[in-house]
Amino acid sequence: MFRKIYTNISITLIKQLREASGSPINDCKKALESTDGNFEKAIQYLKERGLAQAEKKMGNQTKQGVIVAYTNNKVAALAEINCETDFVARTSEFLEFSTNFIKTIVNQEQDFSSSNIDSVLNDKRKQLVGKLQENIVIGNLNAFVATKNSVFGVYQHNCLKNTICGLGGSVVELITESELTDVKTQILREGANNLAVTYLGLKPRFLYQHEVSSDVVDQIRKEVEKEFGSKTAQQQNFIVKGKLQNYYSDNVFEHQEYFLNEDEPKTIKQYMAKELEEVIKDKVKIGRCLYLTI
């Protein structure tokens, strides 16, 4: 038996459903026709349709998207949210979802990973898939909870439409030896934000020199012995030292250039010593760090 299609749907009702659901006009019209003009049932119809479409698009490649970074000073989070096309990545709906997503994660105030996104967030993602007609994936998600002695800095690069969504982002944690005061916190937070900028710009492989494997030193020494075998051991050691300094400058954050102050060149280590440790009269070290780019 064929079901009679309800066609007496007002334009006003269709527009109201469009505003409430964010779904395309044609989908709203079809939803109202399929539910005999019942607004609440039409909302549910669109929700179920969106979930079904999300399942169909799960296998689609997602090579575009945004990076979002955010902190409420207790938790810092950095996420990569992917979609299929650059066009969708710049829509207000996608940027709003990405912004609300990262803020929800941060305000839950717990360590998080992509594997334990709660069902509410996942349902919202699926609904957006139905609206935008593209697969949307949380590609990378990390959240960190501050300790009583640490502060976070965050940075977003190339922000889109005045949001916290961009093409790159970073999080840097600074840790003190003694407990924080309000004054210390304010100074360190500014420093952490500055370091987040440089961390994304420099993209170091290591934070500190001691993290570099002895294998790297051995490899450089072997290369020098092979290339400069005719030179004395003292000369070779001098060359090794120079090559290691270059390696550290290229790969180790503490030895890289703090490029935000071109008038007074200094390394990250020197910046932390002069601008942070001397000012707050306390030892400061870099803790958890992460950067992501599209």
Swiss-Prot record:
Which parts pass through the membrane?
none
Known role: Associates with the EF-Tu.GDP complex and induces the exchange of GDP to GTP. It remains bound to the aminoacyl-tRNA.EF-Tu.GTP complex up to the GTP hydrolysis stage on the ribosome.
MF GO annotations = translation elongation factor activity
Q: Which family does it belong to?
A: Belongs to the EF-Ts family.
The remark listed among the other comments is: This protein may be expected to contain an N-terminal transit peptide but none has been predicted.
Where does this polypeptide localize? Mitochondrion
Please give the positions of the paired cysteines in each disulfide bond: none
Q: Which NCBIfam families match?
A: tsf
Protein's name in the database = Elongation factor Ts, mitochondrial 2
